[in-house]
Curated annotation (Swiss-Prot):
Domain of life: Bacteria
Organism: Alcanivorax borkumensis (strain ATCC 700651 / DSM 11573 / NCIMB 13689 / SK2)
GO cellular component: cytoplasm
Primary location recorded for the protein, binned into one broad class: cytoplasm
Role summary: Specifically methylates the guanosine in position 1516 of 16S rRNA.
Name listed for the protein in its UniProt record: Ribosomal RNA small subunit methyltransferase J
Subcellular location: Cytoplasm
Gene expressing this chain: rsmJ
Length: 247
């Protein structure tokens, strides 16, 4: 079953959603529940959001300046982020970074706030639509350093001008871990995990772009992407950044 067909059994699209998205069009949440759809996409407080039909949880939206994300983007905080340390200092004037698995754009926003010019690539049409909406509401100073590529597109005009390629592929939550966060749980329903072959293809593709380094985000206890040992790593309490330097 293709992903678009599978999403018809999982995701309900409420009136007003962007056209052309995969999913099952419904008139309201009640219809989505009647169709046994797990999630709905629609507008909530002028934001394109994802939530469980009939549920009490706050919809998942792309918002760069609210709550914890807003705190992480403050100038005095962003320079201490482990991701920024993993990116290192650019050579010459190469400050462009390709975030090839943009997701909700949270890490891309950190990189942009740190002064990198970030290109966001996201293959999920649902997440891409949510990113586009979030960027429309983001501060102009942040958006100036962020460029959302066409859905599923990762082509850039001058790959040799890249400082880094950033990868944050989906990773299954540990069965013995505490309740998975809402956003990760819902994203896992929308985006399939890469298998071993896809992991190798993703890493090979990223390294072939000619950037100074490839930075891969992983759970701290997870194995290396595709089993390939990095040049070095930056470890935190929950996540680890594996850095593959390129000649």
């Amino acid at each position: 079953m293709r992903q678009s067909e599978w999403l018809d059994t999982v995701l309900g699209l409420l009136p007003g959603c962007p056209k052309g998205l995969p999913g099952f069009w419904v008139e309201n949440e009640a219809q989505a529940s009647g169709q046994a759809l797990e999630l709905v996409l629609g507008w909530h407080d002028d934001c394109l959001g994802l939530w469980r039909p009939g549920g009490k949880q706050t919809p998942l939206t792309v918002s760069f300046c609210d709550g914890k994300q807003g705190y992480r983007l403050t100038p005095e905080r962003v320079r201490h982020e482990r991701l920024i340390k993993a990116l290192g200092k650019p050579k010459d004037d190469r400050i462009r970074v390709l975030d090839a698995t943009a997701g909700l754009g949270r890490d891309a926003a950190l990189m942009a706030q740190a002064g990198f010019q970030v290109m966001l690539a996201e293959r999920s049409p649902i997440l891409h639509a949510m990113l586009a909406d979030g960027l429309q509401r983001a501060p102009a100073s942040l958006v100036a350093n962020m460029q959302l590529l066409a859905c599923a597109d990762s082509k850039i005009a001058e790959p040799s001008a890249l400082h880094a390629v950033y990868l944050d592929p989906m990773f299954p939550a540990r069965e013995k871990s505490a309740a998975v966060k809402k956003d990760l749980q819902w994203l896992q329903r929308l985006c399939p995990y890469p298998d071993e072959v896809e992991e190798q293809q993703l890493l090979d593709w990223a390294r072939a772009l000619g950037a100074s380094r490839v930075v891969v985000k992983r759970p701290v206890k997870a194995g290396f992407l595709a089993g390939v040992t990095p040049s070095f790593s930056q470890k935190g309490k929950a996540v680890r950044f594996d850095i593959y330097t390129c000649p």
